[in-house]
C-alpha cells in the first residue's frame, strides 16, 4: 500500500523574496512585464521541483499568486470590479484591483483598490471580492490552466488548487443594500463547472477545492448551500474538499453528504477531530490528514505522528493521504538559508522546504519502510530533548508564572482614584494632544541601522546617532506645542521585532520571510524558550528624551498579546503561558520606566482582536487570558502613572467588554476614516475611562485641515465627554515624511487649542 503525499500550497515569494523585488521593479517601471513573468515562472518551476525531489505524490499548481490567491480567483471568474474592468483582464488589471492607482509603467489609471482584510486568523491578508446583484461570472483569467499545463509539460503529477465557490462568496462583501450575495451562487456555479471541465480536459485527476469556511460556525443558509453547490459542479475530476485552521465539528454531518471524493482536515490546529472524522468518513472517500503544521516553523514529531496515524492507515489503507495542515505560504521558505543559527536551534525548526520533506518521509514510514521509520525516530529526537532542556524551560520563569494570582492583574487603585492622582501629577489641559508613538523613519535612520548591523558603525556611534534623531523629534514636538511627547522610536525597526531582539527566549532569522499581502513580507521572530527580560529595554531612550523637555514624555511598549500574535509561538506550551511570560517581562519594564521618571506609559495592543479564535464559543476563554496578560503588564504602575493603550480596528462592538476590562487609563483608537462612527460602541457601552479617537488618517498623504479636525473633535465630544477626550492621530507616523507630519500635527494642535478655549 502506498500513501499519497501532498501539500496544500507552497510559498510564492521565493527564498530571498525574488517575487517581491520583481513586483516592485515592475511597479516602478524598471522592468518589462515579460521579465516579471519570467521571475514567476522560475519560482513555480523551483517550487514544483522541490515537491517532486522530496518524493511527494503530487505537485500542487494554482497556489502561485501575483498578489493574492483570492484576487487571482476573482480574475479567474471574470469578476473584476467595474471601476477596474477594461476588456479582458491582464496582469495590470490584477495589480490595479489590489493596489488602486498604480505608478507609471503599469498602464494603470486611477481607481480605488479593493478592500483588504485578514485571511481567517492568520497574518496573511486577502483582497476582498465585491458583489452586487447584477454580477455575472465567466472563466476569464487563464493563469490556473497555463500553470497546470506548464507543470504537466515538466512531467509532474499535478493537483490544481482552487478556492471553493462558497468560501469565495462568504469572504466577499455586498456593495449594494438589500442584497444577499448568496443569491449569486447559481451563476457562480456555472463558472466553476466550466473550470472543472477545462481541468478535466487537461488530464487532471484530482483537484483540491479549498472551503476553509467549513471550519467556522456557519449560519444555516451557508451550510445548506454546500449540498446544492457540489451537486451542480460534480464532474469527471475527483474533488478533495479541503478545510483548515480549525475543526469541522460543526459542519461534518453536512460534509459527509456531499458528492465529493475526499476530505482534508487540519490535525495541527484541531488534532481532537481525527476520531470523529474517521468514524463518519463515507465509504471510498480519501482522508487527507494535515499533520505537518503549515503555520509554524517547528520540526514535526514524525515518530509521534506515525504512531497516531498508523491505526487510521490500517483502517483506510491507500485512502489515507498525508499532507501539510494548510498551505505552506504561512511558513518561511528554507531553513538552509540560516547558517547563523546554532546547530541545536536549527534542529528544532522546519521551514516550508523541510516540511515538504517531512510529509514525504511520514508517508514512506506509514507504508512500512523500515529505513523511513528509523529516520522519523532520529528526526524527532531533538524535539524530545528540547522538552527537558533547562535553557528552554527555565525554572525561575516557571516559578514566577506559578505565582501569578488575581491580585497581580489589578492596579492598586480604581480608575476614578487614579484619574485624580494623574490630573494632579501630569497637569494636562482639556483635550490634551499627543501622537501614537513613532515618527518618520527617514532614509538616514535606515542607513545608520543597516551600517550598525553590518558592523560598519560602532555601538557608541549608532547610539549617538539615535540620540540625535530623538533630540530632533523632541524639538519638533515642542515647536508644535504638543502636550504629551514621544521619543519617536528611531531605534526600532519594527514594533515587535525590537522587543523580540531584546528579550531572552526569542530567535530572529535572516531570511525567515512570509508574505503579508502583495509584495509586503514580514519576518516574525520565533519564541524558542521561556521569555524573560534580562535588562531594561526602552528606559535609556525614554529617559534621554525626557531629559530634553519639561513636558511629559510617554514611554512606548508593545503589548504581550500583540508580540505573541505577530511572532511564531512555541508549540509545546499554551499561547496563554507565552502571553503571561511576556506580560511579566513588560511588567518589569513598566516598573523601571516609572522609577526613572516616566509618568505616562503606552502599551500597544493592536492584535488583541486579531487573536480571536475562529469559533465564537472559544472567544470568551481567549479574551479572558488576553485581557489578564495586558493587566499583568500594566498593574505594576502606580496610581499616578497613566497607562495608555492603542488599538486600530474597524469593529469594537463584539469586544467592547474586554476593551473596558483592560482598565487602561487612556485608549487611543483609529476613527478618522469612519468619521467617528466607531465611537458609538464606546458611547453605547458608557466607556468609563479616557479615550483618544484618531483625527488624522496617517495612511493617507493628505493633510487634514484645522476645520476638518475641529469637526471630528466636536463629533467625538457628542459621544464622549470632552473632559475624557484626547486629540491624536489614528496611528503611528513611521511611514509618513516630516513635512506631512508637521503640517498635519500643526492643524491638530490648533484645532484642539481653539476648542479648548471655547469649552473652558
Curated annotation (Swiss-Prot):
Pathway: Amino-acid biosynthesis; L-methionine biosynthesis via de novo pathway; L-methionine from L-homocysteine (MetE route): step 1/1. GO terms for molecular function: 5-methyltetrahydropteroyltriglutamate-homocysteine S-methyltransferase activity; zinc ion binding. GO terms for biological process: methionine biosynthetic process; methylation. The active site is at residue 699. The keyword Repeat applies. Keywords: Amino-acid biosynthesis, Metal-binding, Methionine biosynthesis, Methyltransferase, Repeat, Transferase, Zinc. It catalyses: 5-methyltetrahydropteroyltri-L-glutamate + L-homocysteine = tetrahydropteroyltri-L-glutamate + L-methionine. L-methionine binds at residues 436-438, 489, 604. Binds 1 zinc ion per subunit. SUPFAM superfamilies: UROD/MetE-like. NCBIfam families: met_syn_B12ind, PRK05222.1. Belongs to the vitamin-B12 independent methionine synthase family. Catalyzes the transfer of a methyl group from 5-methyltetrahydrofolate to homocysteine resulting in methionine formation. This is 5-methyltetrahydropteroyltriglutamate--homocysteine methyltransferase.
Amino acid at each position: 500500500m502506498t500513501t499519497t503525499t501532498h501539500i496544500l500550497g507552497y510559498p510564492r515569494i521565493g527564498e530571498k523574496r525574488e517575487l517581491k523585488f520583481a513586483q516592485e521593479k515592475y511597479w516602478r517601471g524598471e522592468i518589462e512585464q515579460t521579465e516579471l513573468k519570467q521571475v514567476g515562472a522560475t519560482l513555480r518551476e523551483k517550487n514544483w521541483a522541490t515537491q517532486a525531489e522530496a518524493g511527494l505524490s503530487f505537485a500542487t499548481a494554482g497556489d502561485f499568486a501575483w498578489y493574492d490567491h483570492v484576487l487571482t480567483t476573482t480574475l479567474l471568474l471574470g469578476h473584476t470590479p467595474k471601476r477596474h474592468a477594461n476588456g479582458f483582464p491582464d496582469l495590470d488589471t490584477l495589480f490595479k484591483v489590489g493596489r488602486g492607482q498604480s505608478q507609471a509603467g503599469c498602464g494603470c489609471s486611477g481607481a480605488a483598490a479593493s478592500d483588504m482584510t485578514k485571511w481567517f486568523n492568520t497574518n496573511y491578508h486577502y483582497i476582498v471580492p465585491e458583489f452586487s446583484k447584477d454580477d455575472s461570472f465567466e472563466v476569464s483569467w487563464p493563469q490556473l490552466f497555463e500553470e497546470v499545463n506548464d507543470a504537466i509539460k515538466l512531467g509532474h503529477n499535478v493537483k490544481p488548487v482552487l478556492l471553493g465557490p462558497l468560501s469565495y462568496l462568504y469572504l466577499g462583501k455586498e456593495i449594494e443594500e438589500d442584497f444577499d450575495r448568496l443569491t449569486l451562487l447559481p451563476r457562480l456555479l456555472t463558472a466553476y463547472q466550466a473550470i472543472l471541465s477545462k481541468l478535466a480536459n487537461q488530464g487532471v485527476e484530482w483537484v483540491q477545492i479549498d472551503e476553509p469556511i467549513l471550519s467556522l460556525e456557519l449560519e444555516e443558509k451557508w451550510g445548506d448551500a454546500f449540498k446544492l453547490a457540489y451537486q451542480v459542479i460534480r464532474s469527471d475530476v475527483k474533488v478533495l474538499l479541503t478545510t483548515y485552521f480549525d475543526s469541522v465539528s460543526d459542519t461534518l454531518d453536512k460534509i459527509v453528504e456531499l458528492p465529493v471524493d475526499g476530505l482534508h482536515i487540519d490535525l495541527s490546529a484541531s488534532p481532537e477531530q481525527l476520531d470523529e472524522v474517521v468514524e463518519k468518513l463515507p465509504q471510498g472517500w480519501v482522508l487527507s490528514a494535515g499533520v505537518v503544521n503549515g503555520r509554524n516553523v517547528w520540526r514535526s514529531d514524525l515518530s509521534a505522528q506515525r504512531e497516531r496515524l498508523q491505526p487510521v492507515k490500517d483502517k483506510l489503507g491507500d485512502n489515507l493521504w498525508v499532507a501539510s495542515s494548510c498551505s505552506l505560504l504561512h511558513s518561511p521558505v528554507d531553513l538552509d538559508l540560516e547558517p547563523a543559527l546554532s546547530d541545536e536551534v536549527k534542529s528544532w525548526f522546519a521551514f516550508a522546504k523541510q516540511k515538504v520533506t517531512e510529509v514525504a518521509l511520514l508517508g514512506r514510514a506509514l507504508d512500512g519502510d523500515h529505513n523511513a521509520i528509523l529516520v522519523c525516530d532520529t528526526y524527532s529526537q531533538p524535539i524530545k530533548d528540547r522538552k527537558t532542556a533547562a535553557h528552554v524551560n527555565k525554572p525561575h520563569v516557571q516559578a514566577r508564572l506559578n505565582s501569578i494570582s488575581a491580585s497581580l492583574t489589578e492596579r492598586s487603585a480604581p480608575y476614578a482614584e487614579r484619574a485624580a492622582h494623574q490630573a494632579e501629577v501630569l497637569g494636562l489641559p482639556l483635550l490634551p494632544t499627543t501622537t501614537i508613538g513613532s515618527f518618520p523613519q527617514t532614509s538616514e535612520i535606515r542607513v545608520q541601522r543597516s551600517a550598525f548591523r553590518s558592523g560598519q558603525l560602532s555601538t557608541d556611534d549608532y547610539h549617538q546617532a539615535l540620540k540625535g534623531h530623538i533630540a530632533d523629534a523632541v524639538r519638533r514636538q515642542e515647536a508644535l506645542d504638543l502636550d504629551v511627547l514621544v521619543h519617536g522610536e528611531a531605534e526600532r525597526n519594527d514594533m515587535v521585532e525590537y522587543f523580540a531582539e531584546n528579550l531572552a527566549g526569542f530567535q530572529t532569522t535572516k531570511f525567515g520571510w512570509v508574505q503579508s499581502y502583495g509584495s509586503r513580507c514580514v519576518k516574525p521572530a520565533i519564541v524558542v524558550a521561556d521569555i524573560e527580560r534580562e535588562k531594561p529595554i526602552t528606559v535609556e531612550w525614554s529617559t534621554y528624551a525626557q531629559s530634553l523637555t519639561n513636558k511629559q514624555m510617554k514611554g512606548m511598549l508593545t503589548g504581550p498579546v500583540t508580540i505573541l500574535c505577530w511572532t511564531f509561538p512555541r508549540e509545546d506550551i499554551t499561547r496563554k503561558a507565552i502571553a503571561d511570560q511576556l506580560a511579566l517581562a513588560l511588567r518589569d519594564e513598566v516598573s523601571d520606566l516609572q522609577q526613572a521618571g516616566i509618568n505616562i506609559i503606552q502599551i500597544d495592543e493592536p492584535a488583541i482582536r486579531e487573536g480571536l479564535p475562529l469559533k465564537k464559543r472559544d472567544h470568551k476563554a481567549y479574551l479572558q487570558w488576553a485581557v489578564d496578560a495586558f493587566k499583568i503588564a500594566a498593574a505594576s504602575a502606580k496610581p499616578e502613572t497613566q497607562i495608555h493603550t492603542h488599538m486600530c480596528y474597524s469593529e469594537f462592538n463584539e469586544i467592547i467588554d474586554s476593551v473596558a476590562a483592560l482598565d487602561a487609563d487612556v485608549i487611543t483608537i483609529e476613527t478618522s476614516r469612519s468619521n467617528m462612527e466607531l465611537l458609538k460602541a464606546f458611547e453605547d457601552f458608557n466607556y468609563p475611562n479616557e479615550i483618544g479617537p484618531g483625527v488624522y488618517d496617517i495612511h493617507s498623504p493628505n493633510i487634514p485641515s484645522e476645520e476638518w479636525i475641529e469637526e471630528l473633535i466636536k463629533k467625538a465630544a457628542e459621544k464622549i465627554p470632552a473632559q475624557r477626550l484626547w486629540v491624536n492621530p489614528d496611528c503611528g507616523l513611521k511611514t509618513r515624511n516630516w513635512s506631512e507630519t508637521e503640517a498635519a500635527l500643526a492643524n491638530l494642535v490648533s484645532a484642539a487649542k481653539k476648542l479648548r478655549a471655547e469649552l473652558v
